[in-house]
C-alpha cells in the first residue's frame, strides 16, 4: 500500500437518536444514526403495530362510505 494516500483511521463516537452512544473505529470522528441495536425492533423483540383498521374506518366515516 502506498503511504500518505489513505484517510486517517480514528476512534469514532456513534450517537443514536434514542440516546445510546458507543465507540468504534472509522475515518470520521463522529457519526449520528437514527436507529441502533439498542432501539431497533429486530434486536429488542418488540413490534410496532400499525392501526390500519382504525385508519380505514376514519376514511370511510370522513367520506360517508
Curated annotation (Swiss-Prot):
Cofactor comment text: Binds 1 zinc ion per subunit.
Alphabetic keyword roster: Metal-binding, Ribonucleoprotein, Ribosomal protein, RNA-binding, rRNA-binding, Zinc
InterPro entries named in the record: Ribosomal_bL28/bL31-like_sf, Ribosomal_bL31, Ribosomal_bL31_A, Ribosomal_bL31_sf
Entry keyword Signal: no
Cofactor(s) for this UniProt protein: Zn(2+)
Any one of the GO CC terms: ribonucleoprotein complex
GO biological process: translation
Similarity section: Belongs to the bacterial ribosomal protein bL31 family. Type A subfamily.
Function: Binds the 23S rRNA.
Record protein name field: Large ribosomal subunit protein bL31
Species annotation: Campylobacter jejuni subsp. doylei (strain ATCC BAA-1458 / RM4099 / 269.97)
Taxonomic lineage from the root: Bacteria, Pseudomonadati, Campylobacterota, Epsilonproteobacteria, Campylobacterales
Amino acid at each position: 500500500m502506498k503511504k500518505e494516500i489513505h484517510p486517517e483511521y480514528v476512534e469514532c463516537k456513534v450517537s443514536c437518536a434514542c440516546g445510546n452512544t458507543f465507540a468504534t473505529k472509522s475515518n470520521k470522528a463522529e457519526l449520528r444514526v437514527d436507529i441502533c441495536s439498542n432501539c431497533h425492533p429486530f434486536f429488542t423483540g418488540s413490534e410496532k403495530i400499525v392501526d390500519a383498521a382504525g385508519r380505514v374506518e376514519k376514511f370511510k366515516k370522513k367520506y360517508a362510505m
